Amino acid sequence: RQRQMCIRDSCTGAGDDNLDIDWGYQGKLQFVIVKQSSDAGDHIVESDNTNADASVGYLTEPRSQPIISNFTFISNGKDDVIKLKEGVSGIYTNGIVIDASNSKACIETTKAETFQDAATTPKVTFNSVAFDCKALAVLGDDAGTLAQAEALITTGSNNLYSTDSGGGSYVPTVTGFINGTAERAMTVAD
């Protein structure tokens, strides 16, 4: 199966989710900038497998597996930055996840199938991603444990975490959506 690829995507001012992924989407997005306006927008990414349709089974194939690389996600705090649900897979590489209001989590997970997926291949992975939000992860409906949610994120390599987002020492130096010294010093993943 060939993956569709989107290169150089920017989203601003969306009234709902900026990247709404579901029903088996397996494309690649590279060089993505999302900076939400202060008065609109939900999640920057809402990624699910079968769009809340339990009648067909959340782990139905093909499972959604977006591959998103070289991205900057700056949230306005209306909702958690990335929502993973219903058995979704996904690969997030070389990115920044910031809640500018410091009032929401970087990742929200819902449905137990999201964690069942973590034990299968492909799974959700984050590599070389900087996180700065009020919390690293929160749980939505029927979502397992907070430790499971955080493990989806922290099992990756070369990630940076702020004090609130995983107990690290990362302090964002982003200006607008341009990387600063802290972001340019990150280890880059292939």
Protein language model features and the residues they cover:
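Extracellular beta-rich repeat passengers
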Residues: R1-Q4, R8-D190
